[in-house]
């Protein structure tokens, strides 16, 4: 089994494969270690924004309890390394290596993999574990190549320039483009150390309270064996109850009434966030600019206690571009509304290329079919995992898979399913396993039926939740039938494998 990528997807699926007796597992990873996004993102203040007891995978198996309610980046990265050690994943791993092509050989019924280092590898099963936050998105801004100061992307933080504790920034004027999840964690640290910080905002993020604390020894000791599995079971059970209540309400209210209730709930949440801004930010104009004006889930909600107070510091300046974004950069810094803001360091907090099919590089399946060509008119999968014509290949991430705020929950059920598929093939001595075109068609229709052309997507500010505003890409999104329903679909498929898959066997 060969994994393209060495983040959470590869680590937790490898653990399940080891449990099922798979010995030959190779990870090919661009970075110099496992961890994926937690290897690359080392910026000051980096931490998970989902409760760590749910977010970190394999806590039961690792007999580990996170030290904080929201674990910080170094702890998460160390946890990734510990998983790789426990399951002997370093032995065959290849680091600082990028897969350049993955091509199916119909005669040998194996995948031929090449890399940027000139390697040629062969694998029976390939798992695309590239991750949804794998490729930095550097905004295309006119003149950015003319900038004479220092610059970098948040996921490639240059501590050689800033110093380990940002001590080198005491006489440095810093500009940061973007106010998404990474910027929200970074800006408070810059505010404490830099001579000045200019924050260039396209769209304000919604900032809610972050209830963070250290894990007490007493609480950790009381959890017992299997505590994380029990937590996840309770979460899924709660989601089922919520779905059932929505279903009951749906039968008793009109569509207009349903929309009205959703809008009222959204207004209540946003009013609370707006009030927190007014209560925290001293300058009325700055406070007004920091208020999100869209529906709550248009953009990923953020949780932080120091972001808003940072704008009360005299060295922090908000440049509100009113949705336009920075469109020009000069030799001295970003230019907006005719003003060039002179900065010594320019940080791009512009996120990642999410839901982009080209992230897979070159993958060629049966009958010389290129995956990008197949996806050219829209993604086609079953469960977001299998795609017809690409036998023994599995995809992990978000394309046509269930939407789940805690991505690790999704990766866990996908990893379990992939391990079960591989075990099924090995048990029956199948050479290949591939999804049927009929099952793929069924799932594409499921995705479209549950996604719909929603008012929310039309009204949302551009972002990765709505493909930067490209509403015509409906089938490229998530399955919005609910996470419990997604789990049930997987269970139904595994109970009737022969209906959904075709096999070959010598």
Placement of each model-derived feature along the sequence:
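C-terminal active-site-capping segments
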Residues: 412, 416-506
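Rossmann-like dinucleotide-binding core of oxidoreductases
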Residues: 2-34, 129-272, 341, 379, ...
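Central helical "cap/lid" subdomain
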Residues: 138-151, 332-384
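Short beta-strand to alpha-helix junction loop
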Residues: 63-82, 94, 261-263, 295-306
């Amino acid at each position: 089994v060969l994994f393209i990528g060495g983040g959470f997807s590869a680590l937790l699926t490898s653990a399940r494969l080891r449990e099922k007796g798979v010995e030959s597992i190779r990870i090919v990873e661009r970075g110099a270690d496992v961890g994926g996004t937690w290897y690359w993102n080392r910026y000051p203040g980096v931490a998970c924004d989902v409760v760590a007891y749910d977010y970190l995978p394999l806590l039961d198996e690792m007999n580990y309890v996170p030290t904080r309610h929201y674990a910080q980046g170094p702890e998460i990265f160390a946890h990734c390394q510990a998983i790789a050690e426990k399951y002997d994943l370093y032995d065959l791993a290849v680091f600082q290596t990028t897969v350049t092509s993955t091509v199916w050989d119909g005669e040998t019924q194996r995948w031929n993999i090449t890399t940027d280092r000139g390697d040629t590898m062969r694998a029976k099963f390939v798992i695309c574990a590239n991750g949804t936050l794998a490729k930095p998105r550097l905004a295309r801004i006119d003149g950015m190549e003319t900038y004479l100061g220092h610059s970098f992307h948040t996921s490639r933080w240059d501590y050689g320039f800033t110093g380990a504790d940002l001590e080198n920034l005491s006489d440095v004027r810093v500009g940061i483009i973007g106010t998404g999840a990474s910027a929200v964690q970074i800006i408070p640290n810059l505010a404490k150390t830099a001579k000045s910080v200019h924050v260039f905002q396209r769209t304000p993020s919604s900032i809610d309270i972050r209830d963070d604390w250290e894990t007490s020894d007493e609480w950790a000791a009381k959890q017992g064996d299997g505590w994380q599995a029990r937590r996840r079971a309770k979460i899924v059970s709660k989601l089922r109850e919520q779905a059932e209540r929505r279903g009951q309400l749906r039968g008793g209210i009109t569509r207009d009434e349903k929309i009205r209730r959703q809008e009222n709930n959204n207004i209540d949440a946003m009013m609370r966030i707006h009030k927190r801004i007014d209560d925290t930010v001293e300058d009325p104009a700055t406070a007004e600019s920091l208020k999100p004006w869209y529906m709550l889930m248009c953009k990923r909600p953020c949780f932080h206690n120091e972001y808003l107070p940072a704008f009360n510091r005299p060295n922090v300046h908000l440049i509100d571009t009113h949705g336009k974004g920075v469109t020009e950069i000069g030799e001295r810094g970003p230019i907006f509304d005719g003003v060039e803001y002179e900065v010594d360091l320019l940080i791009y907090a512009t996120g990642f290329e999410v839901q982009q099919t080209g992230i897979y590089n070159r993958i060629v399946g049966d009958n010389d079919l290129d995956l990008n060509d197949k996806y050219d008119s829209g993604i086609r999968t079953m469960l977001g995992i299998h795609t017809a014509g690409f036998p023994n290949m599995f995809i992990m991430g978000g394309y046509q898979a269930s939407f789940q705020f805690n991505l690790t929950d999704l990766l866990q059920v996908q990893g379990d399913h992939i391990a079960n598929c591989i075990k099924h093939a090995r048990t029956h001595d199948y050479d290949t396993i591939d999804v049927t075109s009929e099952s793929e068609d069924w799932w594409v229709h499921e995705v479209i039926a549950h996604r719909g052309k929603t008012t929310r997507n039309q009204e949302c500010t551009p972002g990765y939740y709505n493909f930067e505003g490209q509403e015509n890409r409906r089938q490229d999104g998530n399955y919005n039938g609910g996470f419990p329903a997604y789990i049930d679909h997987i269970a139904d498929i595994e109970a009737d494998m022969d209906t959904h898959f075709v096999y070959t066997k010598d």
